[in-house]
């Protein structure tokens, strides 16, 4: 029996799709328009929209089209809807004036529970080639090596999206990737290590996972944070972690606020 697609409408305070998309952690989301996206995750895709409440413009609601099973067992966790962002946001604002603006501008950001392998590749690529080039590479890898889906969705007719490929799939289609500079050779070595040598990437580079969806926040994530902290906040990373973040449960969220602020600088008023 085919599962029934339902429309789920929920109020989620301190959750903003556009801010999450602009934070650099989900370059493979498909943006339909402001506050409306298609989210590919493994072998599923979700059409999701965020709307202001008609009677209270301080409140937003999420509208999702999916099966009941997928809502509770896939997307609720993927979007990190259990997290109390209001409490964490208030704690981060109390860190001091230099964090108040990033916390206000990114107060709807959640850290997504992404596919481990995809999150690992994304985080590594960001450290190698930066956010913009990493986003291009991630979509190219998925389109060349992943499984293609054409899915009918209300209001958008048919949409094409791609599953993120496994290491085996990347090795099979690696020759089709074309010239991607140092990304090509690194990606091939990584996949060979995983397939042939059982490289446990989920247990290495712990700081990468704290940033991109692994939610292991015992230590502040240091991926690219050294330069960002020194350049924009005048802080040493180790001192920042020890001194500022002792009471913050989701330390990765602090970094996402900073990254979102840096990637989306406010326009200067002339």
Regions from the language model: what does each represent?
Residues 1-270:
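HhH-family (HhH-GPD) DNA N-glycosylase catalytic core used in base-excision repair
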């Amino acid at each position: 029996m085919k599962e029934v697609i339902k429309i789920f409408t929920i109020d989620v305070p301190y959750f903003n799709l556009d801010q999450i998309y602009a934070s650099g952690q989900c370059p493979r989301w498909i943006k339909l328009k402001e506050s409306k996206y298609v989210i590919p995750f493994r072998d599923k895709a979700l059409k999701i929209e965020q709307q202001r409440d008609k009677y209270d413009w301080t409140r937003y609601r999420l509208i999702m089209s999916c099966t009941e099973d997928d809502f509770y067992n896939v997307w609720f966790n993927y979007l990190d809807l259990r997290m109390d962002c209001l409490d964490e946001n208030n704690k981060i604002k109390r860190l001091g004036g230099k964090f108040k603006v990033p916390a206000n501008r990114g107060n709807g950001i959640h850290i997504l529970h992404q596919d481990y392998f995809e999150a690992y590749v994304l985080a590594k690529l960001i450290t190698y080639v930066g956010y913009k080039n990493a986003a291009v590479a991630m979509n190219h890898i998925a389109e060349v090596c992943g499984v293609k889906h054409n899915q009918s969705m209300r209001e958008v007719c048919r949409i094409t999206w791609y599953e993120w490929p496994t290491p085996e799939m990347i090795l099979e289609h690696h020759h089709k990737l074309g010239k991607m500079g140092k990304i090509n050779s690194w990606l091939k070595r990584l996949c060979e290590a995983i397939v042939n040598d059982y490289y446990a990437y989920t247990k290495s580079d712990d700081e990468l996972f704290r940033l991109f969806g692994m939610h292991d926040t015992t230590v502040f994530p240091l991926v690219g944070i050294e330069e960002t902290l020194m350049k924009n906040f005048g802080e040493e990373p180790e001192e920042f972690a020890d001194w500022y973040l002792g009471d913050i449960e989701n330390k990765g969220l602090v970094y996402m606020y900073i990254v979102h602020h840096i990637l989306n600088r406010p326009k200067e008023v002339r």
